[in-house]
Structures are given as structure tokens and as C-alpha cells.
Amino acid sequence: MMKTVNELIKDINSLTSHLHEKDFLLTWEQTPDELKQVLDVAAALKALRAENISTKVFNSGLGISVFRDNSTRTRFSYASALNLLGLAQQDLDEGKSQIAHGETVRETANMISFCADAIGIRDDMYLGAGNAYMREVGAALDDGYKQGVLPQRPALVNLQCDIDHPTQSMADLAWLREHFGSLENLKGKKIAMTWAYSPSYGKPLSVPQGIIGLMTRFGMDVTLAHPEGYDLIPDVVEVAKNNAKASGGSFRQVTSMEEAFKDADIVYPKSWAPYKVMEQRTELLRANDHEGLKALEKQCLAQNAQHKDWHCTEEMMELTRDGEALYMHCLPADISGVSCKEGEVTEGVFEKYRIATYKEASWKPYIIAAMILSRKYAKPGALLEQLLKEAQERVK
């Protein structure tokens, strides 16, 4: 049973949070109360919209988007979040800007932010670069605000980097809270974050890393499964281990999809490229080595093809708790016989859970809006209370 807006506001007001003083770049940099605040603010915004109450807290202002990789769900979720709050979106096309002519990050960050209240960045292609770039932008914004160049400090949101995908994992957590009733009900639940076969290579590590980095915060039993050699960034695996110890949950790694699925309450079969491959790919991309990239792709596709049995089938789902585990995916899934010949999941399994995955995805606009709101307002609970009190109809 979802809480009412008034109940959510009461919960938000009881939390100790400093999100208004920092950017949301990695989930494990935030305290449990700060994570709960984002979830509660998102739930309140979603409930207000369902009741046809306007949530436009900004009368003007821009939300800047910087996408250095392709995106559908996150791009539209970010645009939706901005509109939800009353901000207009402007996409920065780096190829058509002075960045292409050598303009510095410091200068660009300030030049685009005179009337900006939010900047969302996706930069996931280069290991060791995406999150670092976001922090460089953040430092430039801090300096611009401190020096009086900017009248306000825009909220900076990580829309996916090389390390984490916080808007995705937080949307996933919001969906799990909705599905199971509360965060408390997630304690002891087994979630299997598993690699799955895909006919493509080079998929980022940030989704599985985001899942193991966040779900271990809430006492869940997290199992990471992948074939030998498909490791994630070692530092993030250590984060997951430490999180599990602190929360009273567990974290383990296995090399069997069947073992991971056994008695799981939630399964998240998703392809990713091995950490070592992504390191090589980054070096080749930086060197603009097209022949090297082609050779690496050929090698990786051959390696992937050895593991076609890592496939989320009806038989695999039968291994889960009562054969009814919740299937999750960040989308788009590689559906065998639909979007590809052989992929991550069978058509039957995906169709059974298709609506569930759409509901999972539906949380992302509200999560992004909650991150922006929490960065811009020290007391989001009071702001939501005001919106509820005024109760201006969104559509008349």
C-alpha cells in the first residue's frame, strides 16, 4: 500500500539530509536518509501528478542536458522531470558548440548556466572519464557561483557514467519498494544481478554496478553472477561487500546463472562487457584506432557466443522462489526471437513481466525530479506541503 502525500511529507521532514549541499553522482556517497529522501520526494511527486496537482516549483529556468551516448528512456525521463518542475530543457550538442574548438570545461559549464537550475550528464563510454568529467563540471559550477558569475548553483545529476547509473538504480529501488510494500520488506530478499548473453558488445558496466552498489544498502541478499572474465570494476565490488556488512545483508559472487537464480526473489539478467575489455576499448577509442576497435569487437562477440546458455528462460525462472521471482531490466532488453535471434531473455518471460518493467521504468522521471528538487531546496518536505496546500490543477 503506497503512502499518502501527507504521510510521505511527514517522513521527509523526519529525515536528516544534506542533499541540498551536494550533487547526486554515486548512490554510495549518499546516506540512507538521503536515499530515502529521494525515494519519498519521488513518490510524493508521482502521487501529486496522479491527483492532477501541479508540481511546477520553478516559474522559469533551464535544465541543460549533455548526452555523450545514445539514450531514449533517460533522455525522455530527464525532459519529463524538468517539465514536471517547471523548467525548460536545452540540449548541449557538443559537436555544434565551441567545445569542438577547444573551449574548456570550466568555461562551458559557466556559459551554459547563467539561467540554469539543473544540468544532467550522461558520459559512460570511457572508463575512468565519465564520473571524473561530472566532478570537473561540478567544481566549475562551484567556482562560478562562489565568484558571483552564477546567481545560483545548478543541480548536477548523473544520468549514467562509467561507474554508476544512479537514476536507474534508484528508479529500480523505488519500483521494488512499491512492489514489495516497503524498504523494510526488502531485507533478506534475494536479488540476482546476472550477466546474460547479448549479440552486441560494449554494454556499460554501470547498471550492474549501480544495482550491487545500492541494493546492498538495504539488507538484501545480493548475488552477482557472470561467466569467468566478465568482472566489474573491483572498487565497486568492494563497495558492495562493505555495504552488505553495514546493512546486515549479504553479497556474493558466483559463476553460475542457475546458482544465482535458485530461490531468488528478484532477477536482473543483463549483458555487460568485461571490465578488462572496457579498459582496452577506452584506450582504442582515445587513440581513434578504428581497426583495433573492429578487432576487439570481433574478439568479444566470439567470447560472448561461448555463453549463450546465460539466457533467462522459463526453465531458469522455475529455479527462483516458487518459480515467481520478479524479473527486472533497465530496457531495452535483448529479447530472443523479437529484437534479436538469441539474446538475454525469451519472449515468453519478457511478455510475462513486460508491464512490470514498464512500471519500473515509469519511476525514473520522478526520481530525477526528486534529485533536482533535493539539491535546490533544503526543505523539500515544506515545499511539497505548499504544493498540496495550493493544489493548483495541472489540467483544468
From Swiss-Prot:
Q: Give UniProt keywords alphabetically.
A: Transferase
Q: Which GO terms describe its molecular function?
A: amino acid binding; ornithine carbamoyltransferase activity
Cell division in keyword set: no
Q: Name one GO biological process term.
A: citrulline biosynthetic process
EC assignment: the record states 2.1.3.-
| List of residues binding carbamoyl phosphate | 71-74, 98, 165-168, 330-331
Q: Where are the transmembrane segments?
A: none
Keyword set includes Transferase: yes
Q: Its quaternary structure?
A: Homotrimer.
The family assignment reads: Belongs to the aspartate/ornithine carbamoyltransferase superfamily.
The record's annotation in NCBIfam families points to: PRK07200.1, ygeW
Protein name (Swiss-Prot/TrEMBL): Putative carbamoyltransferase YgeW
Q: Which organism is it from?
A: Escherichia coli O157:H7
List the top taxonomic levels of the source: Bacteria, Pseudomonadati, Pseudomonadota, Gammaproteobacteria, Enterobacterales
